[in-house]
Amino acid sequence: MDITLSIPDWIARELSHYPEFLLTHEDRMRMIIHFSKLNSEYGTGGPFAAGVFEQNTGKLISVGVNIVVPSNCSSAHAEIMALSIAQKKLEMFDLGSPGIPSHELVVNWRPCAMCYGAVLWSGVRSLVIAGSGKELE
């Protein structure tokens, strides 16, 4: 049996409005927060989004959103989606491999225990978090 998870179609459309490089953490976070809001507005998942960027250049590698409910998959959190897409795109499971740029994960909310574990295993060098608290737990 195969397992296939797909991000919503609107993401590609929205990404076309953004530059390839987002130079500041503020710009990266602004984009991720925008995607988290759109995910709720479009009804394609919960209010969570994440992005993988090259740490020093701000090059956007991937964006993921929460698709737990539409995919019937409890592990389809935004962080997992963003990391998985980046790993497939770069054709490597270790985003901290020698010889490649350092990567960071930008998230709109504090990761859960599962996602935090995935962050550690992914090899990203930095985790940038917009907020935390009971409001979205």
Regions flagged by a language model, labelled:
Residues 55-61:
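Short, glycine-anchored, charge-dense loop/turn motifs used at functional sites
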